Structures are given as C-alpha cells and as structure tokens.
Amino acid sequence: SPSDYVGMYPRSEPETRALCDFTEKIQPSLTLSYHAKGNVIYRGFECVNPYPQLAEQISASTGYPAYSSSGSSGGYKDWYVTTAYKPGLTVEVGESEWSYPQIQDNMDIVLAANRQVLDICARFVQDNM
C-alpha cells in the first residue's frame, strides 16, 4: 500500500532527500527516527550495524525487540547507517493491530515506554562518539 512505500532506494524520494541534505549539513552523531506501528526497533543491517549496543540499551528500556534488517528498504535510517557508519535507529511505536487513531488514544503508553530513549542516546553519544 502507499502508506508502506519508502522509496526505491535510499534518498529516492524528495522528503528523504531533504532530510538527508539537512543531516549532511549538521552531521549528527546518531539518528533516531520514530514511526508507527509495531513496538520494535530497527537498527542497521546484518552487514552494517555500527554500535549494536545502543539498540540493545533502548530495547531493554522500552521492552521492544531490536532487529537488524537484511538490506535497505530505501528509508532515511538505511541511508544514514550506510554513509555515515554511525548509529541509526528506527523505533516503531504502538501495537501492530492498533489503528493510527488507537495509537493516538494510547499515547500515554507509548510515551511511558519511550521515556528514557533520549537520555540513553545522549549518554551513548557522550560515552562513545
């Protein structure tokens, strides 16, 4: 479906190109993308997975499992980890069976699960980058 389309390859879509251009300008130590839904964390790929401990720390905090994907799906995180070779994570929030309005209705659950994520990322950058 169109809602699942992320592009043919990293940086193929205008909104992704704009975000990539901004990222190249500011050169962050890591990227953290939030999407809905699934209650999972996607880190780099099996062959490009810099700093897997960051995903594991966030997984321990949120209770969401962390996975490496087998290859690029064309998204922002995919582009970032393969060009910067720095940590890039996508956190999918909300139960898979929830509709998008249900995610909004359950935002207190989502926020509670993700309360420590930014602190974990900041500590990680301070200690490792």
Predicted regions and their residues:
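Catalytic cores of secreted/periplasmic or lumenal enzymes
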Residues: 53-69
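Low-complexity, flexible helical/coil segments
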Residues: 65-73, 124-129
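Loop/turn elements at helix/coil->beta-strand transitions in domains of secreted/extracellular proteins
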Residues: 25-31, 61-65, 85-87
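Short glycine-rich, acidic/polar surface loops and turns
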Residues: 71-88
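Structured segments of extracytoplasmic/periplasmic soluble domains
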Residues: 22-26, 61, 116-124
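Active-site/substrate-binding loop(s) of hydrolase catalytic cores
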Residues: 1-52, 56, 90-102
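His/Asp/Glu-rich mid-to-C-terminal helical/loop segments that flank catalytic regions of hydrolases
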Residues: 99-129
